[in-house]
């Protein structure tokens, strides 16, 4: 396999000769992303260099998890993996579909017309139905992780934080504005409904053109939520596992909930109704992705015969393993060796 090496944004970028016209798109904490032209498929693609994938055992596990998720999760509303390889410098490169922009960039320009918000929300929930049916929680759903092309096709990306639903889970995940209250309150026990809360926040932001709960820190974030929803009900407070957090919540001044109709007076009744069933303190009372797809607001797009669930659960057996870096590297090589370019 022949590799071509270039310096891009101060980073060595190595690709196989299959990929031409490599141009930088963005640089983040976990990787450099470039656009390129795939000379075999004759399609434009995104090539992501994963930075220091084996820097330590924790990062190696995160890298392995993201690769496994991209390989197994195949759906029209999830970013599709086309190729994967390890370069001569032992960096990992992921090749995925290339979409022109993301929802975050669109929202920085202006609010969306209702018809676009409707279509994007349908696709978000369609993707979440599939993810959740595979036993996966995204945990970091936000506008910048929702890629969009010129046809308004939407694809969920960035599965670096995705996890299995477990009894105990870490508290600091997801970008603050879209973070479900149970993450802030209980810190450890939560499930797939954190993604549903995030989707509700994104729907409100699409129509308003600005975040619904733009907290400066997690305490301010929680305060902004109570300004709309009121104090958390007793059944939610009882689920808080931290005694300190429970005392703080119980000491809050009484805050009556505001009707969402008063908060979003410019929205139509159907979207208010959907938001009321997504943005609930109690995750057990929120609509699932599958039931939300049946809501009247999404009726123009809902098709139960074209909203597939995963055929099998994702295998999380590796997730609790405490393995040395060399073992993760070997497992990664095995995974990459069996990677195929498969259509969604």
UniProtKB/Swiss-Prot annotation:
UniProt keyword Kinase, yes or no: yes
Which Gene3D superfamilies does this one have?
Answer: Phosphorylase Kinase, domain 1, Transferase(Phosphotransferase) domain 1
- InterPro entries annotated for this entry? Kinase-like_dom_sf (IPR011009), MAP_kinase (IPR050117), MAP_kinase_CS (IPR003527), Prot_kinase_dom (IPR000719), Protein_kinase_ATP_BS (IPR017441), Ser/Thr_kinase_AS (IPR008271)
Chain location of the short sequence motif TXY per the record: 170-172
| SMART domains, sorted | S_TKc (SM00220)
Give details on activation and inhibition. Activated by tyrosine and threonine phosphorylation.
Query: GO terms for molecular function, please?
Result: ATP binding; MAP kinase activity; protein serine kinase activity
Record Pfam families: Pkinase (PF00069)
The chain residues annotated with the modification Phosphotyrosine are 172
- Keywords from the UniProt entry: ATP-binding, Kinase, Nucleotide-binding, Phosphoprotein, Serine/threonine-protein kinase, Transferase
> EC number(s) in its UniProt entry?
2.7.11.24
Relay the domain remarks: The TXY motif contains the threonine and tyrosine residues whose phosphorylation activates the MAP kinases.
Q: What name appears for this protein in its UniProt entry?
A: Mitogen-activated protein kinase mpkC
Q: Which organism is it from?
A: Aspergillus oryzae (strain ATCC 42149 / RIB 40)
